[in-house]
Amino acid sequence: MVKNLVLWVVVAVIMMTAYQSFNSSSVENSTDYTTFVYDVSNGQVTAARFDANEITVTKTDGSKYSTVMPPLEDKKLLDDLLSKKVKVEGTPFERRGFLSQILISWFPMLFLVGVWVFFMRQMQGGGGKAMSFGKSRAKMLNQDQIKVTFADVAGCDEAKEEVGEIVDFLRDPNKFQNLGGKIPKGILMVGPPGTGKTLLARAIAGEAKVPFFTISGSDFVEMFVGVGASRVRDMFEQAKKNAPCLIFIDEIDAVGRQRGAGLGGGHDEREQTLNQMLVEMDGFSGNDGVIVIAATNRPDVLDPALTRPGRFDRQVVVGLPDVKGREQILKVHMRKVSVAQDVDAMTLARGTPGYSGADLANLVNEAALFAARVNKRTVTMLEFEKAKDKINMGPERRTMIMTDKQKESTAYHEAGHAIVGYLVPEHDPVHKVTIIPRGRALGVTFFLPEGDQISISQKQLESKLSTLYAGRLAEDLIYGEENISTGASNDIKVATNIARNMVTQWGFSEKLGPILYTEDEGEVFLGRSMAKAKHMSDETAHSIDEEVRAIVNRNYARAREILIDNMDILHAMKDALVKYETIEEEQIKQLMNREPVTPPSGWGEPKTQQAAYANSTTNDTKPESAVENTDDFNV
């Protein structure tokens, strides 16, 4: 606020000075003293105003001009003016004190000097003060401000064990120093977005009870040259004054990217900042008691000099949680929500493979919002299922009008997926089938894995292929080949990619054998070539296409045979989907056993609740979900 006030004062003084200069230069027309005397003698002057040695003259025609009286006594002038009956006026001399004269004379200079001193003092300050570009933007949090502990971090037990030594060192450094051991100078936490890297860093500071400096990698480099390196120096100077302490640099790949990489060349500001960081972390001057923790989801782009031992001695992988980790994370977030007794965290964890900690937190929040919309006192399993479906596939599009024929076609399509997925060997169990449009999909078939899959066998892949093609085959068997819709476009895309990877990467072709036919050339910005080298002949490429086609045809034929043998179940499942729109695991088992179908949970709830569930604006799609396919209706 003070800086803005000073700025406006400076602008006002400049405008006043300009106005006065303009005013003084734009007064009445000036002429010589001889003309004035001539006009007086000819009787052309009606009034004369004397202001020191300046005379303002008014002529008989009303025009005015000014002239300056020379420093000579003209005793005859007054007599001539009076004889011609000219109105004579005078201005008294302004009597100013000595101090007033000095103030008026020196005020502009003193004012400018004061403004200059003000800005110079601001430059010596830190933080966000004026022109303090070289000061660190790191925010320091004291131990009283950090309330996060290891109890708030779940799903990454291995990572917590890795960083546990840091906490012990910060609590009792002599324990390690007496034995001659050295604590790691830096820890690089690597993992996908949302896995809890920042949360884990805050938990380390909360457990160790030490100051915590936090900054983003993008906060170093500015528009001015040298600012990034200056901020790095200032950050480490502040950290040394508060040692022992932690420095957390989030998204370090913004400043620690590999030097000399990319399509361009030459030196840039980012490299200068990185060089200064390398020196500060492991240079001639030590930084004992200062531990640097950095987080990134792109470790492959970091400079090797930054990740070597002595700077970041230890890399801690904070990966996506497994089913047990997801259960623990869900329980942590459910503490803040009033959850009903029917909510099973393990069931939710099984149905959310590939979810990060942030995704699970969003799942719990969405379920709470669903319950609040219908004025429930607790969050039930129904709200969690609706929240999971919304995150996986987007909100329900109940306003989308589908004809009876479109509903029937979609029901046959999804029933084909469900029947083949239920009967092929080693496939994930069918969890839910719906024909309610979600996002870009007209219908969805959900499969619930029994556990996390670290690797997948050839039999599982081929079962997946049969299931993917089953939706298209169901339409073919019911309506004929000429009436197949474009709903299977995404199924075909996914199946083709799986079949091609089986041949070119995973060695599941007897003819071509376990040979890699594709190579990852890396990214262009890492200094690698833009051109992709061809590692196979045209004959080999033709053989690959033949093997891919053989795998697809084999599983296509198997899916057709399964559907032909179970046409009665296909028709019954279609009828159930048209009636209920969504069927769950219990109804699917009844249909597969050819038993009467009971209504699914939530069937018959008030329309107001259904509308409240449907009125959702978030479209947070997640491609790594347990959804088997999405029937894209856009051609």
Swiss-Prot record:
Residues where Zn(2+) binds: H413, H417, D491
The entry's keywords: ATP-binding, Cell inner membrane, Cell membrane, Hydrolase, Membrane, Metal-binding, Metalloprotease, Nucleotide-binding, Protease, Transmembrane, Transmembrane helix, Zinc
Residues that hold ATP according to the record: G191, P192, P193, G194, T195, G196, K197, T198
Compartments (UniProt record): Cell inner membrane
GO cellular component terms, A-Z: plasma membrane
Complex and partners: Homohexamer.
Co-factor binding details: Binds 1 zinc ion per subunit.
Documented EC number(s): 3.4.24.-
Pfam families per record: AAA, AAA_lid_3, FtsH_ext, Peptidase_M41
Name the UniProt record assigns to this protein: ATP-dependent zinc metalloprotease FtsH
Main location as per UniProt: membrane
Residue ranges with Polar residues bias: 607-620
Biological processes annotated in GO: protein catabolic process; proteolysis
GO molecular function: ATP binding; ATP hydrolysis activity; ATP-dependent peptidase activity; metalloendopeptidase activity; zinc ion binding
Cofactor field: Zn(2+)
InterPro entries: AAA+_ATPase, AAA_lid_3, ATPase_AAA_core, ATPase_AAA_CS, FtsH, P-loop_NTPase, Pept_M41_FtsH_extracell, Peptidase_M41
Transmembrane segment boundaries: 5-25, 98-118
Membrane topology classification: Multi-pass membrane protein
Biological role stated in the UniProt entry: Acts as a processive, ATP-dependent zinc metallopeptidase for both cytoplasmic and membrane proteins. Plays a role in the quality control of integral membrane proteins.
All ranges on the Periplasmic side of the membrane: 26-97
Family according to the record: In the central section; belongs to the AAA ATPase family. In the C-terminal section; belongs to the peptidase M41 family.
Segments for region (Disordered): 593-635
Ranges per topology, Cytoplasmic: 1-4, 119-635
Biological source species: Haemophilus influenzae (strain ATCC 51907 / DSM 11121 / KW20 / Rd)
